[in-house]
Swiss-Prot record:
BP term (GO), one: hemopoiesis
Transcription found in the keyword field: yes
PROSITE patterns cross-referenced by the UniProt entry: TFIID
GO cellular component, one term: nucleus
Gene Ontology molecular function terms on file: DNA binding; DNA-binding transcription factor activity; transcription cis-regulatory region binding
Family statement: Belongs to the TBP family.
Record protein name field: TATA box-binding protein-like 2
Subcellular location: Nucleus
Superkingdom assignment: Eukaryota
InterPro entries linked to this entry: TBP (IPR000814), TBP_CS (IPR030491), TBP_dom_sf (IPR012295), TBP_eukaryotic (IPR033710)
Gene3D superfamilies, per database record: TATA-Binding Protein
Species this protein is from: Xenopus tropicalis (Western clawed frog)
Chain's gene name: tbpl2
Keywords assigned by UniProt, alphabetized: Developmental protein, DNA-binding, Gastrulation, Nucleus, Transcription, Transcription regulation
Length: 322
């Protein structure tokens, strides 16, 4: 009996301890796992184990990578070479890329400022489609003034003309309708020639200046008036001016046509001169080996002078050295 009673008391005591333990777990507030203190087992040190794990995580020099395929090792080496080359290239060019700036989006104002800066730094010129005369820097003026040799002008007499009557009664006039359908009339001062058509149109050639051309045309109109025709003097206009000059040195035309083949043509078997068609001003030049130059196609005297000043430094570059 005493043994049974002592056994029962022992069991009751154990049950009471279990109830207290369970109630303590139920009513105690929960704490985060980080606040729980780690109770090391006797005979072990966690600090040394943590330090050893850190060393293992950071140091891979002793790890054997022989089991990896060669392709992966080659790719890693290529990536490292690209990174080092890009870094060295940035250092050489003075460009530094900031990852924080790249991650931030640009604002519209910044984009607009960047576009304006780029247009200011790198303007794109609009080149014309038509060929332009090559511009050669003129170091000094040529000192040569082309002389006008011929001026062609036209005028309208504004009346119908009887060419046979004009040829019979006017001096220094000839008319051959089988050869040319106009009266050819000449005067001595200024020394010019006129072509008079039955429609009343007249062409005056041979004058050496603009004033001489106008004066000669008026004299021809006066002759026609004296023959009984109601001639007027309308729409006088200079159609062509011809000038010439000498640069006083021989020119290598073969080299000139090769360099400026877009503007020039040279066929010595057909014509001994090089034909150079200038775009601005619109003048045609005949250039000869001797250095003589003929300029034609101008409407004004200034175009003759401008064309020669443009072509002179080019001719100087192809001067023959004997």
């Amino acid at each position: 009996m005493d043994g049974e009673s002592s056994l029962e008391r022992y069991l009751d005591q154990c049950d009471a301890e279990d109830v207290l333990a369970s109630s303590a777990h139920m009513y105690t507030p929960m704490t985060p796992y980080d606040d729980l203190a780690i109770q090391p087992l006797p005979g072990t040190s966690y600090s040394s184990a943590l330090e050893q794990s850190k060393e293992l995580s950071t140091d891979f020099s002793s790890v054997d990578l022989s089991f990896l395929p060669d392709d992966l090792n080659q790719e890693n080496e290529d990536q490292q070479e690209q990174q080092t080359s890009s870094q060295s290239l940035e250092q050489d060019s003075g460009i530094c890329l900031d990852a924080s700036n790249l991650s931030q989006p640009f604002t519209p104002s910044e984009c607009r400022d960047a576009s304006q800066d780029s247009t200011n730094l790198c303007p794109m010129p609009i080149t014309p489609m038509t060929p332009m005369t090559p511009m050669t820097p003129v170091a000094e003026s040529s000192g040569i003034v082309p002389q006008l040799q011929n001026i062609v002008s036209t005028v309208n007499l504004a009346c119908k003309l009887d060419l046979k009557k004009i040829a019979l009664h006017a001096r220094n006039a000839e008319y051959n309708p089988k050869r040319f359908a106009a009266v050819i009339m000449r005067i001595r001062e200024p020394r010019t020639t006129a072509l008079i058509f039955s429609s009343g149109k007249m062409v005056c050639t041979g004058a050496k200046s603009e004033e001489q051309s106008r004066l000669a045309a008026r004299k021809y109109a006066r002759v026609v008036q004296k023959l009984g025709f109601p001639a007027k003097f309308l729409d006088f206009k200079i159609q062509n001016m011809v000038g010439s000059c000498d640069v006083r040195f021989p020119i290598r035309l073969e080299g000139l046509v090769l360099t400026h083949q877009q503007f020039s043509s040279y066929e010595p078997e057909l014509f001994p001169g090089l034909i150079y068609r200038m775009v601005k001003p619109r003048i045609v030049l005949l250039i000869f080996v001797s250095g003589k130059v003929v300029l034609t196609g101008a409407k004004e005297r200034s175009e003759i002078y401008e064309a020669f000043e443009n072509i002179y430094p080019i001719l100087k570059g192809f001067k023959k050295t004997t």
